Amino acid sequence: MDVRTLAVGKAHLEALLATRKMTLEHLQDVRHDATQVYFDGLEHLQNVAQYLAIPLSEFFVGQTQSDLDDGVKIARRNGGFKREEIRGGVHYYTYEHLVTTNQDPGLMALRLDLHSDDEQPLRLNGGHGSREIVYVTRGAVRVRWVGDNDELKEDVLNEGDSIFILPNVPHSFTNHVGGAKSEIIAINYG
């Protein structure tokens, strides 16, 4: 290992990435083994921290400057991270980050285009460690989740409807009408 190389625990970095709906595959130029992820010096790690909008101090004890400009940060259309979510061969979502800031790393706002409907097999996520509020901005959305008795629940949300989901509740959103495209805004926090 080079003297300049910085190591961050792999599980810790994966947890940070999960708050951004990302995986190690979404980072370029990082090496890793079973337990560590290696960065080519502090500048490399700072660039990754800035890209994720997560304070450098979340990676290790240190200081980071605010990414706000006079108390605000603006994210422009098509300027943020975007990825496709494929579950078991089914194209479920296109995730697009809304504004992220290192001043509130536990907050993740996403715009999602829904691609699946009842024609594809149901694929719930495994739940996640954050609370979630979802608002339907376009279309009609079928939401499914696992209830308290491990029973599959479902409902339909129309444009303007919203839902709150506790941490670790497996859930999924699909288009309610086959062939129609829906859009949701998801706010994950805490």
Swiss-Prot record:
Keywords: Antibiotic biosynthesis, Dioxygenase, DNA-binding, Iron, Metal-binding, NAD, Oxidoreductase. Non-heme-dependent dioxygenase that catalyzes the oxidative epoxidation of (S)-2-hydroxypropylphosphonate into (1R,2S)-epoxypropylphosphonate, the final step in the biosynthesis of fosfomycin antibiotic. This is (S)-2-hydroxypropylphosphonic acid epoxidase. Its EC number is 1.11.1.23. Pfam families: Cupin_2. InterPro entries: Cupin_2, RmlC-like_jellyroll, RmlC_Cupin_sf. Binds 1 Fe(2+) ion per subunit. Homotrimer. Substrate binds at R87, Y95, N125, G126, G127, H128, E132. One of its GO terms (molecular function) is dioxygenase activity. Belongs to the non-heme iron-dependent dioxygenase family. Residues 128-176 form the Cupin type-2 domain. Residues 10-60 form the HTH cro/C1-type domain. It comes from the Bacteria. Its cofactor is Fe(2+).
